[in-house]
Curated annotation (Swiss-Prot):
Function of the protein: Involved in the biosynthesis of the tuberculostearic acid (10-methylstearic-acid or TSA), a constituent lipid of the mycobacterial cell wall. Catalyzes the transfer of the methyl group from S-adenosyl-L-methionine (SAM) to the double bond of oleic acid in phosphatidylethanolamine or phosphatidylcholine to produce TSA.
Pathway info: Lipid metabolism; fatty acid biosynthesis
Domain of life assignment: Bacteria
Protein name: Tuberculostearic acid methyltransferase UfaA1
Reported pH dependence: Optimum pH is 7-8.
Length: 427
């Protein structure tokens, strides 16, 4: 039996559904790696406003009792997972219930904001500690793209409805004034989502009689807002579940005659439109396909016409470091995805297209608050997930995903922009 296959099962976890979570790495290599990881944990806690609290009641780290605490229930299992699998192991350990925190987002924000200064480059918390290479597949073939989308967006419309607002919008909202009101209430989220959509439609010049293409439908709110302006909109998606519910929502709003929602890869769309809009879709394209994605945007908008996209970004050097590896997010949440950097978007549009960037507006603090509201809503309704067929491991996975994402925006590790581009050439 090899070191890699010698593992101890974790109790009460479905090993068929969660094979990696159900097994704790065993053997001499795992033990040696665990010793290093344990020293790293303790070293990190002494340098950060963070407390590590162990199952025997001992604690290390910040002296301030107000500092966020990470409760370690199975220290050896956590260390073995981190030692062998880095961030993936850290996430799988949370999924297995081996550690927890009453202030999960604060813990992750502290770690995210300090990786470059406190942890050696090969041991960054928010990157793989030991390189885990991505599964090999062709350059995001159409079949692979459909499978990647289905893993996340076809989970269940009821799951997303449990924590999204009435607009069923699954992207960064735009609140009125976060300086005056830094923690908006849940009741403000739907209006903030419509405000975000309206800004995109404004910069895209969508008005009465416009012919608009949307790449990435979501659940149809942008279609509804565009049609309410008198525009005709075609929207394409790879999600069967999203297409079904989006069509229902559009019909219920009375705009079925103005909106067409197709199950179609963006690479197969033809024709030209007055404007093109795409909200947080580039993240799923895959970095090898980014030039093709922007070339498609250029080809699909009329000469002189606007393109409006919303995109989550990460620092350029971290994007380069992670593009050939697999992270916990890619393994469990968004397979095949990668966040671009602002530099990548600027370089690709400049080198591969005739699209000219005319505006880029950051909404970073808005995304932190959007994710906070989603996370709080998700936790309020967490107990109902079992009725949808999702177990406790899934619930912990999604709690970590939402908190991890919120921490990324709060720490500045992640950003999100609304970009306006114009296709150069005579109208």
């Amino acid at each position: 039996m090899t070191v890699e296959t010698s593992q101890t099962p974790s109790a009460a976890i479905d090993s068929d559904r969660w094979p990696a979570v159900a097994k704790v790495p065993r053997g001499p290599l795992a033990a040696a790696s665990a010793a290093i990881a344990n020293r790293l944990l303790r070293r990190t806690a002494t340098h950060l406003p963070l407390r590590l609290v162990y199952s025997d009641g001992t604690a290390t780290g910040a002296a301030d009792p107000r500092a966020p605490s990470l409760f370690i229930h199975r220290p050896d299992a956590l260390a073995r997972r981190i030692g062998r699998h880095g961030l993936i192991g850290f996430g799988e350990s949370y999924m297995a219930g081996e550690w927890s925190s009453k202030e999960l987002t604060r813990v992750l924000t502290v770690l995210a904001g300090s990786v470059d200064e406190l942890v050696p480059r090969s041991l960054h918390w928010l990157r793989p500690i030991t390189p885990t290479f991505r599964p090999s597949w062709p350059d995001h073939s159409r079949d692979q793209a459909r499978r990647n989308i289905a893993v996340h967006y076809d989970l269940s419309n009821d799951l997303f409805a449990a924590f999204l607002d009435e607009t069923m919008t699954y992207s960064c909202a735009m609140f009125t004034d976060l300086l005056a009101q830094p923690t908006p209430a849940w009741t403000e989220l739907a209006a903030a989502q419509r405000r975000k959509i309206d800004r995109l439609l404004d910069v895209a010049g969508v008005q009465q009689g416009s012919h608009v293409l949307e790449i990435g439908t979501g659940w149809g709110e942008l279609c509804i807002r565009a049609a309410a302006r008198g525009a005709h909109i075609r929207s394409v998606t790879l999600s069967v579940e999203q297409q079904r519910l989006a069509r229902q929502r559009v019909a219920a709003a009375g705009f079925g005659h103005r909106v067409e929602i197709d199950l179609c890869d963006y690479r197969d769309v033809d024709g030209q439109y007055d404007s093109v809009v795409s909200v947080e879709m580039i993240e799923a394209v895959g970095y090898r396909s980014w030039p093709r994605y922007f070339a498609a945007l250029e080809q699909l908008v009329r000469p002189g016409g606007p393109v409006a996209i919303q995109a989550i970004t990460m620092p350029h050097h971290r994007m380069l470091a992670t593009r050939h590896t697999q992270t916990w997010i890619q393994k469990y949440i968004f397979p095949g995805g990668l966040l671009p950097s602002t530099q990548a978007i600027i370089d690709i549009t400049g080198q591969h297209t005739g699209l000219r960037i005319v505006d880029a507006a950051s909404l970073r603090p808005h995304y932190a608050e959007t994710l906070r509201l989603w996370r709080e809503r998700f936790m309020q309704r967490r107990d109902g997930l079992a009725h949808l067929g999702f177990d406790e491991v899934f619930a912990r996975m999604w709690e970590l995903y939402l908190a991890y994402s919120e921490a990324g925006f709060r720490s500045g590790y992640l950003d999100v922009y609304q970009w306006t581009l114009i296709r150069e050439g005579p109208p």
